């Protein structure tokens, strides 16, 4: 049976914060945990499903992979076993994890490294840039490791073990039947204290700076695609691992083309004499212009497909087409002489209207039949 969407399992939207994900899982865990539903197989399955969703959506790396590739992006995490790969854990362990994070704590009685936050950057591209690809230099305000203390927060000295929590970074507290962990108020979860803080970073181990990065944009990228730059997010506290930078692509509207998948579409205006008599037109494409032969009696709305003049697919390499939509233009601002010629032409058409304007004649016949049948 196909797995359900993790966001659907927890009942949250795709923009849910980590706190909202935790709250949703806590509600489901209280309802379906096997300790509260002994012998209930349905509750057991629902609990496993909720915990799997929680494990993915509360991990920024797993969540990013899931958002981009679906279940295939995280299947190795669970060894292909699906929800069945999880143990239940007792309620204290589960809520110790959740409450610990809410109050700034961590699991396992060990100090937690405070990994740097992930960053997002919107990159606006022209259609030509998105189709052909390029390298773009961007500037990102962020936190970097302090160069003076190399990220330790302690210039010329070493951090000492926190005397309050003995290096665990956590203090255990009892809340009714639950035993939860709370971040140590002295070391703030690090497990170490700095007696001589670095004056440049005030003991944080990092400083604010604008980084200049080169981003390689692959050909065929489109609005909504993301490029992940691993380790280019904010530096972690006290030398902890950095976060990632996600470059979100947005392609600007183009005056001539609009994109649908790997195909490009373009409206091509045409004067009515060329539409009636045929001819040749020069059609712009993203790779230069091409000559298009227009057959006589071309009607408005006719589509011409130029093979291979679309977009090269980002992953498969297949190339789309350019689809030209013909718009027959009615002449405006006619001179008296031009109007006279058109009137003479119209009189000539009326002599054999069924052959010259079959769609018009068929339409009038349909209208006549509609009213006479009532």
From Swiss-Prot:
**Which residues form each disulfide bond in the chain?**
none
Q: Where is Zn(2+) 1 annotated to bind?
A: 146, 149, 198, 201
Location of this chain's protein in the cell: Cytoplasm
* UniProt keyword list: Chaperone, Cytoplasm, DNA replication, Metal-binding, Repeat, Stress response, Zinc, Zinc-finger
Tell me which Gene3D superfamilies the record gives.
Answer: DnaJ domain, Heat shock protein DnaJ, cysteine-rich domain, Urease metallochaperone UreE, N-terminal domain
Q: Does the keyword Oxidoreductase apply?
A: no
Q: What Pfam families does the entry give?
A: DnaJ, DnaJ_C, DnaJ_CXXCXGXG
Intervals holding CXXCXGXG motif repeats: 146-153, 162-169, 184-191, 198-205
**Bound how, and how many: what does the cofactor note say?**
Binds 2 Zn(2+) ions per monomer.
* GO cellular component assignments: cytoplasm
PROSITE patterns in the cross-refs: DNAJ_1 (PS00636), DNAJ_2 (PS50076), ZF_CR (PS51188)
The principal location of this protein is cytoplasm
**Residues that bind Zn(2+) 2, according to the entry?**
162, 165, 184, 187
Instruction: Write down the required cofactor(s).
Output: Zn(2+)
Keyword match Ribonucleoprotein? no
At the top level, the lineage of the source is: Bacteria
Domain J: residue ranges: 5-70
- Output the InterPro entries linked to this UniProt entry: DnaJ, DnaJ_C, DnaJ_domain, DnaJ_domain_CS, HSP40/DnaJ_pept-bd, HSP_DnaJ_Cys-rich_dom, HSP_DnaJ_Cys-rich_dom_sf, J_dom_sf
**Which stretches are zinc fingers (CR-type)?**
133-210
NCBIfam families named among the record's database cross-references: DnaJ_bact, PRK10767.1
Q: Self-association or partners: how does it assemble?
A: Homodimer.
Q: Which family does it belong to?
A: Belongs to the DnaJ family.
Comment, domains: The J domain is necessary and sufficient to stimulate DnaK ATPase activity. Zinc center 1 plays an important role in the autonomous, DnaK-independent chaperone activity of DnaJ. Zinc center 2 is essential for interaction with DnaK and for DnaJ activity.
Q: What is this protein called?
A: Chaperone protein DnaJ
Question: Taxonomically, what lineage is the organism?
Answer: Bacteria, Pseudomonadati, Pseudomonadota, Gammaproteobacteria, Legionellales
Name the gene that codes for it: dnaJ
């Amino acid at each position: 049976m196909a797995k359900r969407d993790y966001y659907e399992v927890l009942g949250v939207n795709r923009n849910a914060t980590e706190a909202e994900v935790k709250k949703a899982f806590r509600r489901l865990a209280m309802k379906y945990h096997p300790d509260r539903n002994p012998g209930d197989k349905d509750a057991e399955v629902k609990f496993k499903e909720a915990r799997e969703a929680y494990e993915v959506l509360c991990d920024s790396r797993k969540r990013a992979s899931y958002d981009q590739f679906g279940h295939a992006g995280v299947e190795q995490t669970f060894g292909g076993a699906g929800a069945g790969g999880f143990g239940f854990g007792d309620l204290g362990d589960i809520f110790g994890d959740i409450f610990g994070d809410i109050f700034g704590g961590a699991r396992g009685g060990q100090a937690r490294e405070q990994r740097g936050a992930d960053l997002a950057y919107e990159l606006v591209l022209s259609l030509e840039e998105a189709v052909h690809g390029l390298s773009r230099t961007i500037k990102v305000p962020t936190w970097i490791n302090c160069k003076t203390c190399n990220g330790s927060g302690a210039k010329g000295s070493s951090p000492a073990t926190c005397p309050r929590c003995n290096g665990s970074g956590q203090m255990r507290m009892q809340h009714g039947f639950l035993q939860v962990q709370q971040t140590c108020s002295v070391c703030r979860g690090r497990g170490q204290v700095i007696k001589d803080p670095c004056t440049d970073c005030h003991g944080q181990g990092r400083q604010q700076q604008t980084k200049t990065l080169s981003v390689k944009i692959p050909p065929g990228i489109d609005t909504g695609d993301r490029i992940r730059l691993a380790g280019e997010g904010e530096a972690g506290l006290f030398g902890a691992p950095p976060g990632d930078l996600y470059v979100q692509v947005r392609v600007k509207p183009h005056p001539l083309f609009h994109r649908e998948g790997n195909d490009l579409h373009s409206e091509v205006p045409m004067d009515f004499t060329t539409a009636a008599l045929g001819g040749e037109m020069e059609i712009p494409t993203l790779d230069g212009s091409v000559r298009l032969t227009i057959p006589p009696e071309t009607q408005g709305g006719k589509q011409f497909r130029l093979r291979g003049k679309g977009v090269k697919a980002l992953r498969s390499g297949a190339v789309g087409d350019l689809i030209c939509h013909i718009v027959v233009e009615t002449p405006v601002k006619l001179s008296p002489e031009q109007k006279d010629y058109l009137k003479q032409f119209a009189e000539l058409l009326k002599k054999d209207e069924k052959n010259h304007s079959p769609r018009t004649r068929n339409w009038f016949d349909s209208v006549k039949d509609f009213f006479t049948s009532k």
